[in-house]
Structures are given as C-alpha cells and as structure tokens.
C-alpha cells in the first residue's frame, strides 16, 4: 500500500503517516497484522525517510483511539506503546506529531459510550445505499465520524502552527454532536 504513495510523491507534498491500529492486534485471528513496537518504529522511519527523499513533508499521526469504555463510562487508553513510539520517532527525526489517539479519546469521553456509536459504521438494513443489508462495524467510521477525526487533525495542524495551517480554510470548530442524533 505504501509504494504507490511513495512513487507518486512530489516536492512539497504533505504525507500524513498514521499506522498502528491494526499493527498492535495480537488476537489469533489477526496474527498476520501484528507488528512489534520495534518493527513499527522501523516502518515509521522508512516512511519518513522515503517521504523526505522526495522532498515531501512528513507529519506523524498517532493511531485513532479505539472506542472502549470502562464500567464507569470513562474512555480507555488503548494504544499506549504505539502512541509513545510515534512520539519517540517524531522527536528523533524532527517530525511533527498529531496526537489523534488522545484527542479522539477526549471526543469519545464528551460523547459517552452510547453517543460515540454515532461515529461508527453501525448501519441498519436499508439505511445506506452502499450497505443495503446494514453494517455493524465498531472499528471504522461512518462519514460523520471520519469528518470529526479530520476536524481534530485540522485543528491540531492549526494549534501547532504547522506551515500547512495557512492553507486550511476551516477548522477550529468546537466539538459538536451529530445533528441527526436527539
């Protein structure tokens, strides 16, 4: 998946590097996806090096938080080692880091365990033309959830005063809840 991106890079392109959600899955059914933290860091460094070789600009993004809550309704940290690895590599290679892990978890906390489901691909039969039989997917986002994650990234680009911030026309909106949800 990376090579076509690397091959098409041009000077001045921005490359947002976000991996880790699947890499840390140790469950037997996901064994082929698992990447140890040291190998994960090697992959990040490879992407940074190849991006810079094309005079493009890398930006690291921590893995998006999993939608996991404890019994009291507190959003749980689920990517500790991998998020730390992103920050270590970012510091070592002087690459900005957007902490989507922390910021998405903060959004989940605001929404709570029930309302956070409105970000997910949880569709009833007939609800969406692309999924006529419905879809129950707690990992991937629906359009609204994806837009909320993009909003977090845009806001952090502005907050960090990255060069790219001058090209962002929107962002810095206060967190909102899906208007369709009552």
Where are the regions a protein language model picked out?
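Alpha-helical cap/lid subdomain in secreted, periplasmic
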Residues: 1-147, 151-169, 177-181
């Amino acid at each position: 998946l990376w090579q076509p991106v690397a091959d098409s890079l041009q000077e001045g392109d921005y490359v947002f590097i976000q991996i880790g959600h699947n890499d840390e899955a140790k469950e037997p059914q996901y064994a082929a996806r698992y990447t140890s933290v040291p190998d994960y860091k090697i992959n990040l460094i490879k992407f940074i090096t190849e991006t810079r070789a094309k005079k493009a600009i890398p930006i690291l993004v921590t893995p998006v938080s999993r939608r996991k809550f404890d019994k009291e309704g507190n959003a749980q940290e689920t990517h500790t080692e991998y998020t730390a690895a992103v920050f270590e590599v970012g510091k070592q290679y002087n690459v900005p880091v957007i902490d989507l892990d922390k910021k998405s978890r903060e959004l989940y906390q605001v929404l709570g365990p029930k309302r956070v489901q409105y970000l997910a691909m949880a569709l009833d039969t007939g609800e969406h033309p692309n999924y006529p039989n419905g879809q129950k997917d707690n990992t991937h986002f629906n359009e609204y959830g994806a837009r909320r994650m993009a909003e977090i990234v845009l806001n952090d680009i502005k907050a960090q005063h990255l060069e790219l911030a001058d090209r962002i026309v929107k962002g810095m909106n206060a967190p909102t809840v899906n208007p369709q949800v009552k």
